[in-house]
């Protein structure tokens, strides 16, 4: 814009433009144009800033409301998990699987496995009610989706395959503000010896996201926290993926003891412990098969092949 003013204004001063300007007239016009151009650009930026502020305010306004009092969470007790005709998937897409029926009792460990992207983790998250599911999930006759978030918090414990750790100490990460001694749970996940060898022991800070721990240590610490809070329904999504077979076998024995009052859903692609599970869910090609390990080996060739392939691996 300034270049055009200089060009055409110069022609007017020289008498070859559409009119004749004096130097004073040209200088005045150029100064006014510069001022207006500067103010106009600031006005555009101000308009954009106001528009962004309005959008941001709409987003945060619900968060500015008074938070309702959080009721005390009681873990309670669950005797029976019933799943009927369960369908899971992402909204708008073909379901990952459908027709899952399962009945499990307190003290049982249920394995979930299948090929990649068959819906194992999606099934685990269905117990959190993060997205709608078809069919029914009932705990002692109560539909999970109809419970309040606080009630579900007291009933369901979830451990994802990416451990979520806080930047506090090992003790704080296990107890989450509760009192007590976390060593029994650290012992159950074979982490007690490593913690004892640390200079600050239980007061060792793990760093944001557990960056000061190895992958296996972070995974075991998150599992210790899940076991410490003893929810009636435990969802463990691939909790042994960063561990060797010997450590996994030892932790599984402790899991049986510490989770004796819970129903455990164990999601894993490693099957050598599955013969010890009470039931197994096999997900593949949109279908769900449920049975004991022996039953699935006999009637599901893909499950049998995957188990045989892993059985030959050395620990």
Annotate the PLM regions.
Residues 76, 136-138, 171-208, 252-253, ...:
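ABC ATPase nucleotide-binding domain helical subdomain, centered on the C-loop/LSGGQ "ABC signature"
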Residues 127-129:
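Helix-to-loop junction immediately C-terminal to a conserved catalytic motif
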Residues 132-143, 152:
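Conserved ABC transporter NBD signature motif
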Residues 1-27:
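A hydrophobic transmembrane-helix motif
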């Amino acid at each position: 814009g300034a270049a055009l003013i200089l060009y055409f204004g110069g022609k007017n001063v020289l008498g070859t433009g559409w009119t004749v300007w004096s130097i004073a007239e040209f200088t005045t016009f150029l100064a006014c144009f510069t001022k207006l151009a500067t103010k106009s650009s600031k006005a555009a930026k101000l308009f954009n800033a106001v528009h962004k502020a309005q959008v941001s305010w709409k987003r945060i306004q619900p968060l500015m409301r008074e938070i309702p009092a959080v009721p005390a969470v009681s873990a309670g007790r669950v005797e029976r998990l019933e799943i009927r005709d369960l369908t899971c998937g992402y909204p708008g897409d073909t379901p990952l699987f459908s027709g899952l029926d399962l009945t499990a009792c307190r003290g049982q460990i249920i394995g979930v496995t299948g090929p990649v992207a068959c819906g194992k983790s999606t099934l685990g998250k269905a117990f959190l009610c993060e997205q709608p599911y078809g069919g029914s999930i009932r705990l002692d006759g109560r539909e999970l989706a109809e419970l309040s978030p606080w009630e579900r918090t007291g009933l369901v414990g979830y451990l994802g395959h990416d451990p979520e750790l806080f930047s506090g100490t090992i003790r704080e990460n296990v107890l989450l503000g509760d009192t007590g001694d976390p060593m029994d749970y650290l012992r159950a996940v074979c982490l007690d010896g490593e913690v004892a060898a640390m200079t600050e022991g239980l007061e060792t800070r793990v760093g944001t996201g557990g960056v000061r721990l190895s992958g296996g240590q972070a995974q075991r610490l998150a599992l210790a926290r899940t076991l410490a809070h003893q929810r009636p329904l435990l969802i463990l999504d691939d909790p042994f993926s960063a561990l060797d077979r010997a450590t996994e076998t030892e932790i599984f024995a402790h899991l049986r003891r510490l989770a004796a009052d819970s129903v455990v859903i164990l999601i894993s692609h490693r099957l050598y412990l599955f013969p010890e599970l009470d039931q197994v869910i096999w997900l593949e090609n949109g279908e769900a098969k449920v049975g004991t390990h022996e039953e699935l080996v006999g009637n599901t060739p893909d499950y049998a092949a995957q188990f045989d392939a892993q059985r030959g691996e050395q620990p």
